[in-house]
A protein has these predicted regions:
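Short, acidic, metal-binding catalytic loop of nucleotide-sugar glycosyltransferases
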Residues: 23-32
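N-proximal low-complexity "stem/linker" segments adjacent to membrane-targeting elements
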Residues: 1-23
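Short beta-strand-to-loop acidic/aromatic patch adjacent to the donor-nucleotide binding site
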Residues: 118-129
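Catalytic core and acceptor-binding pocket of nucleotide-sugar-dependent glycosyltransferases
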Residues: 175-248
Length: 270
């Protein structure tokens, strides 16, 4: 029996980018089922860093696409973020320093996806441009596999970064070693030891620190990392420059649906 393979996309107010992400997946030969976890809602960002208070309207993902299932969380049907934060105020801490990854919504969404997709999944964000088939990441010996973004625009730390680029979670392997949730608050970077013959990875990076410290079977060869830029930073956020958004759209223009146009015949000789 073939192993179940699922692509999970976390969607937030950017339907045109989610569509482009799905089309880029299909473009590179992946016919795996796609699950879109729709967190779209109206949100007001407070003033700060030289920007006024601003409100982003809700833009849920409504497009019908073959092989795509949408999990509607626009009204908190799956995860009621406000209620969860009230119950666990110290567990979920916002991390909006780098493109919003690590926010409470992302953290709780990934935890929910672990419940909904118990056989493992590849997690991508809506503003990712796939340039090759990600099937190489789907390997049962890995507990975690990821592509790394190297000094891409939007990464103010100037270091390689995994999430939320493109990563594979082997949920059964995680669970076998007592890992039942993913916490970006303690799982930010993964640095491979260049001179270490044991293929060692920096703690305090990918996976939980205590997993790396106390679950040695999840370390080393059971983690795979492949350097590759698969993300054009900044394009998915309404508060970034129009130039950045235009660059993203230009890079993805062949993936967007275009309205049918009536061809006109020019009677003049060419």
């Amino acid at each position: 029996m073939a192993k179940k393979q699922t692509i999970a996309i976390i969607h937030f107010n950017t339907p045109e980018l989610t569509e482009a992400c799905i089309l880029s997946i299909r473009k590179h030969g992946c016919d795996w089922p796609v699950v879109v976890f729709d967190n779209s809602r109206e949100v007001t960002f407070p003033a700060g860093e030289g920007m006024p208070e601003r409100t982003v309207e809700a833009h849920p993902f409504k497009k019908k696409m073959k092989g795509v299932k949408v999990i509607d969380n626009t009204k908190g049907q799956q995860v009621d973020f406000e209620k969860a934060l009230q119950a666990f105020p110290d567990r979920h801490k916002p991390h909006a320093e780098v493109n919003g990854w690590g926010s409470d919504c992302h953290m709780m969404t990934v935890e929910k996806l672990w419940e909904l997709l118990p056989d493992g999944f590849i997690l991508v964000e809506s503003d990712i441009l796939l340039r090759e088939n990600p099937a190489v990441m789907w390997n049962e010996k890995y507990s975690f596999a990821a592509y790394v973004q190297k000094q891409q625009r939007g990464n103010k730390f100037g270091r390689g970064r995994i999430l939320p680029m493109l990563c594979y979670f082997n949920v059964p392997k995680f669970s076998a070693y007592g890992v039942h949730y993913f916490d970006p608050d303690r799982s930010w970077m993964l640095h491979k030891g260049e001179d270490n013959p044991k293929n060692w990875y920096d703690t305090g990076a990918s996976l939980l620190e205590d997993v790396l410290a106390h679950k040695p079977n999840l370390v080393g060869l059971n983690v795979d990392i492949r350097p590759m830029v698969v993300h054009l930073g900044g394009g998915s956020y309404k508060n970034v420059s129009l130039k950045a958004q235009a660059e993203w759209l230009k890079a993805h223009e062949d993936l967007f649906s275009k309205p049918e146009t009536t061809k006109r015949t020019n009677s003049k000789s060419k």
